[in-house]
């Protein structure tokens, strides 16, 4: 009687699935337990606690998604770009919220340049200094030694309109270049100013525009690159990458342009694309990315 040999890959996959399910279960139980004890004491429910719940909720959803893919991925094969999209959206939104404003290295310098670009868009540009709403100029953020109180201070009045919306000349100067790398973050600030949002919401919108541009560029790159899709996906999901693309840093736009140049060039040389329109679009994106980079 022949004895069938056990497939080691199947055993490894089973262990990974069980591990993911256990982590997901523990995280879900922990999140419910924390929420239950906090609800009993309404005075302890603050911005930090809400942010805490959002973070664990997003991680729970992400782990559940990865677990489902691990269990049924072989039967229903999902392309890399479709697998990447929900992961980058969840992790990107998470990093956007949990990394305090001004904490990313030199972010304050990038914020002032983006704000200056917003002034150009709104016709309030000053050649000498950055014109800002008085509320935005006076709002203080702690960039070092972040504590629970700093999170509460940052998100206090997130959805409230500021009182001091008059424009004033500040001591800040726009020094970063090339300036076109700040168009999207400046657009986010402009949207916030037009909507009359709070200072924190204003800056979060600027960050969000950088993140969305990176997501779109990386999604297109993974779709177009003929091989190495997994490497691009892992690079895009690295903590240091997410930190930069979820901030005002021009690294976000540089990362997007770099990966577009690599992917479109490799697609033009090694790709087996038969659709003429797709090839034309790929070549246009390649040339535009090279020029901007």
What residue ranges belong to the model's regions?
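Start-transfer (signal-anchor) and selected internal transmembrane alpha helices
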Residues: 1-23, 28, 35, 45-93
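Transmembrane-helix signature of polytopic, membrane-embedded enzymes
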Residues: 19, 197-200, 219-240
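Transmembrane signal-anchor helices characteristic of membrane glycosylation enzymes that use polyprenol
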Residues: 21-30, 67, 71-108, 115-156
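Selective detector of the "anchor" transmembrane alpha-helix that sits immediately C-terminal
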Residues: 52-68, 202-227
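Interfacial juxtamembrane loops and adjacent helix segments
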Residues: 120-205
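Hydrophobic transmembrane alpha-helices
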Residues: 185, 189, 218-222, 259-271, ...
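Short acidic/glycine- and proline-prone juxtamembrane loop motifs at membrane-interface regions
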Residues: 247-254
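Membrane-interface alpha helices of multi-pass inner-membrane proteins
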Residues: 280-293
């Amino acid at each position: 009687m022949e004895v069938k040999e056990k497939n080691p890959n199947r055993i490894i996959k089973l262990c990974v699935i069980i591990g993911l399910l256990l982590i997901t279960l523990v995280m879900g139980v922990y999140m419910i337990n924390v929420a239950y004890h906090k609800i009993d004491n309404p005075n302890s429910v603050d911005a930090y606690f809400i942010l805490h719940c959002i973070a664990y909720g997003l991680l729970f959803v992400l782990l559940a998604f990865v677990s489902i893919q691990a269990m049924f991925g072989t039967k229903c094969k999902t392309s890399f770009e479709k697998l990447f999209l929900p992961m980058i959206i969840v992790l990107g939104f998470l990093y956007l919220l949990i990394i305090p404003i001004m904490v990313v290295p030199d972010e304050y310098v990038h914020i002032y340049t983006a704000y200056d670009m917003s002034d150009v868009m709104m016709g309030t540009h000053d050649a000498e200094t950055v014109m800002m709403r008085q509320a935005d100029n006076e709002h203080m953020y702690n960039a070092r030694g972040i504590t629970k109180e700093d999170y509460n201070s940052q998100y206090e009045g997130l959805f409230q309109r500021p009182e001091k919306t008059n424009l004033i000349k500040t001591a800040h100067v726009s020094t970063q270049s090339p300036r076109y790398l700040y168009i999207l973050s400046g657009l986010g600030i402009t949207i916030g100013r037009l909507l009359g949002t709070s200072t924190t919401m204003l800056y979060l919108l600027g960050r969000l525009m950088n993140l969305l541009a990176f997501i779109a560029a990386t999604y297109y790159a993974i779709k177009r690159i003929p091989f190495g899709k997994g490497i691009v996906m892992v690079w895009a999901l690295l903590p240091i990458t997410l930190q930069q693309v979820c901030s005002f840093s021009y690294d976000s736009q540089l990362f997007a342009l770099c990966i577009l140049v690599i992917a479109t060039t490799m697609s033009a040389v090694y790709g087996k694309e038969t659709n003429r329109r797709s090839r034309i679009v790929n070549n246009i994106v390649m040339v535009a990315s090279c020029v901007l980079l």
